[in-house]
Amino acid sequence: MERVLIVNADDFGLSKGQNYGIIEACRNGVVTSTTALVNGAAIDHAAQLGRSTPELAVGMHFVLTLGEPLSAMPGLTRDGRLGKWIWQQAEEDSLPLEEIAHELACQYHRFVELFGHEPTHIDSHHHVHMFAQIYPIVAAFAREKGIALRIDRQVAAQSGLDQQAARSSAGFSSEFYGEAVSEELFLQTLDASIARGERSLEVMCHPAYVDRIIMGSAYCYPRLDELDVLTAASLKAAVADRGYRLGTYRDV
């Protein structure tokens, strides 16, 4: 049975080092897809690289935790900026859902302006679209636009979210992350998906070259390790040996 593997590199547009790492992992590795932060410091650079790398599918990385929003969000920003206090607001059930829905539309339109096409799919920075209050908004938007959505099946099940609310891959893994990233860890995510009988799987990753912006991230040097693993010839062979075809969200 053929299986589809989507290797999605998050954070396109975060920095030039991030952008170059993603392009390298696509051209010389197993990365097939990326998602872009339209308010990122290097988003124009990302759009330029994306146009010269047509084999890289580009989706939208919805941002509610970093930088400045594209629209006025007085209910979520502090001093005009987004931040991780969104978790506290979610726990307090005080999220400004109308503002979030409007910002989602603004970021979508900005994506189309930058890249010249619709995103292949939507996910989000720090997985905020999987919050119980935000998920229905993003899922309905993706369905309306006819595009796919990253769905973390485990989180959705725990939160009682409708897993059929939007088109998605059968499985999703965020486990290729952290100080211990390795080829073995990557392949373990594939083997676990095979054991679950999933015909399609998205593996999240963050390959990058380190620059000043990345050095300011809590997740820094492992991005280099990810790049090494994702561009290893042995990994591509092992993926094929397991019956996977490298693909994108257009294939699900």
From Swiss-Prot:
Pathway: Glycan degradation; chitin degradation. One of its GO terms (cellular component) is cytoplasm. One of its GO terms (molecular function) is metal ion binding. Its cofactor is Mg(2+). It is found in: Cytoplasm. InterPro entries: COD_ChbG_bac (IPR022948), Glyco_hydro/deAcase_b/a-brl (IPR011330), YdjC-like (IPR006879). It catalyses: N,N'-diacetylchitobiose + H2O = N-acetyl-beta-D-glucosaminyl-(1->4)-D-glucosamine + acetate; diacetylchitobiose-6'-phosphate + H2O = N'-monoacetylchitobiose-6'-phosphate + acetate. Mg(2+) binds at residues 61, 125. Its main location: cytoplasm. Its EC number is 3.5.1.105. Coiled coil: none annotated. It comes from the Bacteria. Keywords: Carbohydrate metabolism, Chitin degradation, Cytoplasm, Hydrolase, Magnesium, Metal-binding, Polysaccharide degradation. Belongs to the YdjC deacetylase family. ChbG subfamily. Homodimer. Involved in the degradation of chitin. ChbG is essential for growth on the acetylated chitooligosaccharides chitobiose and chitotriose but is dispensable for growth on cellobiose and chitosan dimer, the deacetylated form of chitobiose. Deacetylation of chitobiose-6-P and chitotriose-6-P is necessary for both the activation of the chb promoter by the regulatory protein ChbR and the hydrolysis of phosphorylated beta-glucosides by the phospho-beta-glucosidase ChbF. This is Chitooligosaccharide deacetylase.
